[in-house]
């Protein structure tokens, strides 16, 4: 699963889930990245610089993946090898999603993993208050501050 998170308000702005990380090669990861970049444009932030931070996995360091950034104002950032603590926000979000699979959501009630993840993302962005956001949801927080 690929997740793109806006660390300003902890909103998941792009994601993709597949049966296998390598099942469709770079296509899996490009789709999630394109969702995030298109979301950036829809929100009116095309001209603002964006930092995309990833680990050093083979997909994220590939030429094909990095070519996507050429037409966007994106700065690449990568964790040091074997150092997940360089990206604690996304590591925490991944951990939360895995816990939610068993606690708040019954994965057995879903026909597909994609639908399950769609619901988790919707819940995160629209219904899950965060201490860091003064107990507001990601959408409420950015809206109250006047952002799209």
Model features per residue range: what roles?
Residues 66, 70-74, 96-148:
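C-terminal domain-tail junction helix/linker
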